[in-house]
Amino acid sequence: MLEMTEAVASAAHSVFGDRLPLAQRYVEHLATSGIERGLIGPREVPRLWDRHVLNCAVVVELIEIDATVADVGSGAGLPGLCLALARPDLSITLIEPLERRVTWLSEVVADLGLSDQVTLFRMRAEQAVDEVNCSVVTARAVSALDKLAGLTIPLLHGNGQFLAVKGRSAAEEITKAAKAVRKLGGTRTDVLVAGSSVLEEPTTVVRILVGSAHR
């Protein structure tokens, strides 16, 4: 089991609660088979908890109760599986086009006992529009916001929110994507911070509201 600092352990307990053992098991998958099968780089192991898993999981602060969530470009389950672990009330669909990643995700979902909560689609986001019914779309490290908006906003079918985990370039990306977002039906775009009460470095999230979805 990967060791955690006291601060990270406290944050993990706060975020995952009684599902912390499952989160720990997920991190072990990332640190072993996730590396062996090319889903995550070996240099990321020392910071799996704070830089990746907790960084993603705190986004649940921005998601309403009992929401249906589609995670685009799920890769190693970041942020989709982290959200599922942190919030048992959420219904999560992982959308990932690469077969080897979907195979790994399927194995991990089964091992964690999340099959009733998490569904996997092996397809591109554009192909999932007619397959997915969701109120929230999430993505992390997929592409720049202007391109990403075109892949994700259509999944909301005119109403909901898109949450993109971003870094310091968030404001600049919003400016570049403004025209595309408006054309796609985005009604408001904000830069929000999640996890400020539990993380030393909170997560920056770009939120795009679509239709009547206002918080």
Curated annotation (Swiss-Prot):
Name the record gives this protein: Ribosomal RNA small subunit methyltransferase G
Locations listed in the record: Cytoplasm
Gene source species: Renibacterium salmoninarum (strain ATCC 33209 / DSM 20767 / JCM 11484 / NBRC 15589 / NCIMB 2235)
Disulfide-linked positions: none
GO molecular function: rRNA (guanine-N7-)-methyltransferase activity
A cellular-component GO term for this protein: cytosol
Main function: Specifically methylates the N7 position of guanine in position 518 of 16S rRNA.
Domain of life: Bacteria
Keyword match Methyltransferase: yes
Keywords, alphabetical: Cytoplasm, Methyltransferase, rRNA processing, S-adenosyl-L-methionine, Transferase
Binding site residues for S-adenosyl-L-methionine: 73, 78, 125-126, 140
Name of the gene encoding the protein in the UniProt record: rsmG
Record carries keyword tRNA-binding: no
